[in-house]
Regions:
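Active-site neighborhood of glycoside hydrolase catalytic domains
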Residues: 362-368, 379-485, 490-498
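Acidic, contiguous N-terminal accessory segments
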Residues: 71-79, 86-242, 246, 469-476, ...
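Conserved, mostly hydrophobic/aromatic
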Residues: 22, 73, 156, 216, ...
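Feature activates predominantly on carbohydrate-active enzymes
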Residues: 196-388, 392-398, 407-416, 457, ...
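Flexible, acidic glycine-rich loops studded with aromatic residues
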Residues: 468-485, 489-626
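Intrinsically disordered, low-complexity Pro/Gly/Ser/Thr-rich segments with frequent PxxP/GP/PP motifs
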Residues: 50-87, 462
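Short acidic, flexible loop segments centered on an aromatic residue
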Residues: 29-58
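Asparagine-centered strand-capping/turn motif at beta-strand->loop junctions
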Residues: 12, 23-29
């Protein structure tokens, strides 16, 4: 317990403004003569409304300098406002704090005191636990009597090259079975069936044998995923006959590793879970304002400087761990390791290099290339930065993009690179002589066209490297990129439909249903955001993609699939990550895989009970909805 405590209390709120009192208590025997309070909060503070001391904010990192002495046993109090609607969750408050005087002191932060804390949890139906708990639900499954019991040292006969990596995954996932690859037909056989469609599989488990049929490596991986769920934490598989295939070809999850850095073992654990629930794409968000996480050999500064943040570092402390140097990055060798690990489980790894906004880490690392020192434009990003956008008018920007994209394209075998392109703030580039000159040269009338100008260059560069460009829905702003760009819609499904009508292929990732950083319940103590929605498990499960679009509408063919996403401003530990992921990841898996006519909420809950036992047996944290 610290000798200093910080309390934040809502004292007044309207539809668009909230006023707070903040109290710092000194429970020590020390008197602080000259001191500064540092704290982090994800909301934007109106510094001009502060009543005591001098308040400033950069991103989530706030500095309060006081001229008043803080006596031992005394308190310091101030008030300030946020231009925000009424707050609903305690995590809207201060995340962490510390004081610097003659030395640095830790500060205990109490939960935000809300005016009217709300608690309105959605009840979960009481259902019996299923005997077979496969998620997502197969299109056809017949459960027979009896079980197949694995004897130690069983061999798997692999009848085709496409099945080998799935067999190796099974061996690795269940080491207690002592499995190995066999050279001749036996009790466990993986066979190719060329008549099966892409990603499909058939699994037959009898008391004497296990036979898995598929036509490609992803189909075999999906079949192994079902077999692993049949086994659970044991050595027996219920006898079943399964014929299965996905509704959507693309089923992905995006993980933000910039806001907080996730260790390599956690990346692999996420990939394991994706494979078990038959996802086939891992979208790796590797760069953002708060950290550059991928080694680029052409620019070692990106990780020497851009991967680390702290109070006195070029990249300012943000969110959690603000009292010390924090960060990390993945070497190219580690990334190759992740790619191979994912491939063995039927998953393709898609890198994201977020441009032209969300680039503060890159700009701070490479100011000699990326900083336009004569740009007087005034803007503020959604995350409260005023210096996080690349300039389309600097030669250094294109040198940076060329070298980074060349290394990324060589490193990742997937045919796609995601370039972000979201949340470029209003006002950017408007007071830059260099940018205005580019607009004049090309006949642009709106500064927003400069985003399209830059992204068209990136699209052409990626095409020359054999890659197709992916981007958030803002990638088509400025009307410069071609319809070869694939759009990921995050603000709403309607945005995806509009892009598809324009001729773009799209991936559905509406924050209202698929964002795993949204709070999971109507309870003030829950962690998460809610700008898109409070997203309980039931709400995620009942997402019906394109439900208002006729099945015969050509737009249906423009939709590749569905993706879940986890932004990590509030997620700084393995336990919190897993808590936010499970069990909504399972619900979204069923949305993406299973036909709507085969889905049933109570049946899902019945299977989920068995699935959660499997998570617990593997030591994986989750939020228990029951």
């Amino acid at each position: 317990m610290s000798l200093f405590r910080l309390d934040l209390k809502v004292i007044n709120q309207t539809e668009q403004r909230t006023r707070f009192s903040m109290t710092l208590s000194n429970h020590s025997s020390r008197t602080l003569e000259e001191w500064t309070l540092y704290f982090s909060i994800t909301r934007f503070l109106d510094a001009s409304s502060n009543t005591q001391g001098e308040l400033s904010q950069l991103g989530s990192f706030c500095t309060l300098q006081s001229l008043a002495t803080l006596q031992a046993g005394a308190q310091f109090a101030t008030e300030f406002e946020m231009p925000t609607p009424p707050l609903q969750l305690q995590c809207d408050g201060i995340l962490e704090a510390f004081i610097v005087a003659s030395e640095q002191y830790s500060v205990d932060v109490t939960p935000l005191q809300l005016i009217e804390p709300k608690s309105n949890p959605q009840p979960i139906a009481k259902v019996h636990k299923a005997s077979v708990g496969i998620i997502p639900k197969p299109q056809e499954i017949h459960i027979d009597s009896g079980v197949f019991e694995f004897a130690h040292n069983e061999a798997i006969f692999v009848g085709c090259d496409q099945a080998k990596q799935a067999a190796l995954w099974l061996i690795e996932a269940k080491p207690e079975l002592g499995l190995s690859l066999g050279k001749e037909a036996n009790k466990i056989e993986f066979k190719r069936l060329e008549s099966l469609p892409h990603q499909s599989y058939q699994l037959e488990v009898t008391s004497n044998s296990i036979t898995l049929f598929a036509n490609d490596y992803q189909g075999f991986s999906h079949g192994v995923a079902s077999l692993l769920q049949l086994l659970g934490n044991g050595t027996k598989a219920t006898c079943v006959q399964i014929s299965d295939s996905p509704v959507y070809d693309y089923r992905g999850m995006m993980l933000d590793c910039s806001r907080h850095f996730h260790q390599l073992d956690q990346i692999k654990l996420i990939i394991d879970q994706l494979a078990r629930y038959k996802y086939n794409h891992f979208h790796w968000h590797l760069t953002d304002d708060e950290g550059w996480r991928i080694e680029i050999k052409a620019f070692p500064e990106l990780t020497d400087i851009g991967a680390w943040r702290g109070k006195d570092l070029p990249l300012t402390a943000q969110f959690k761990h603000i009292d010390s140097k924090y960060g990390g990055f993945y070497s190219q060798e580690q990334i190759k390791e992740v790619i191979a690990y994912a491939k063995c489980r039927g998953i393709s790894v898609i890198p994201e290099i977020d441009i032209p906004g969300h680039c503060r880490a890159a700009i701070k690392a490479l100011p000699h290339l990326l900083l336009d020192r004569d740009d007087k434009s005034i803007y503020r990003s959604v995350q409260h930065y005023t210096d996080n956008v690349l300039s389309p008018a600097l030669e250094g920007t294109y040198e940076f993009l060329d070298r980074v994209l060349e290394e990324v394209a060589e490193l990742f075998p997937a045919p796609y690179v995601h370039i972000g392109a979201d949340e470029v703030p209003e006002g950017v580039w408007t007071d830059s002589e260099k940018c205005q000159a580019v607009m004049t040269e090309y006949g642009y009338s709106d500064a927003k066209e400069l985003q399209g100008h830059l992204l068209r260059y990136v699209e052409n560069k990626l095409s020359s490297l054999g890659k197709r460009m992916l981007g958030w829905e803002e990638a088509q702003y400025g009307d410069k990129v071609s319809q070869q760009t694939v759009i990921y819609s995050w603000q709403s499904e309607e945005a995806a439909i509009k892009c598809a009508r324009k001729g773009f292929d799209v991936v559905l990732q509406p924050g209202q249903y698929t964002y795993l950083d949204m709070a999971q319940e109507f309870d003030a103590t829950e962690s998460g955001f809610y700008w898109a929605n409070i997203t309980p498990l039931k709400h995620a499960y009942h997402y019906r993609p394109l439900s208002e679009i006729e099945a015969s509408d050509p737009i249906q063919q423009k939709v590749w699939g569905i993706q879940a996403g986890l932004w990590c401003e509030l997620i700084d530990s393995a336990e919190r990550l897993q808590y936010m992921v499970h069990p909504r990841l399972q619900a979204i898996a069923e949305v993406a895989w299973t036909k709507e006519t085969n889905k049933d909420w109570n049946d899902f809950l019945s299977r989920l009970q068995l699935d959660l036992e499997g998570l617990e047996g593997r030591g994986i944290h989750y939020r228990n909805p029951f």
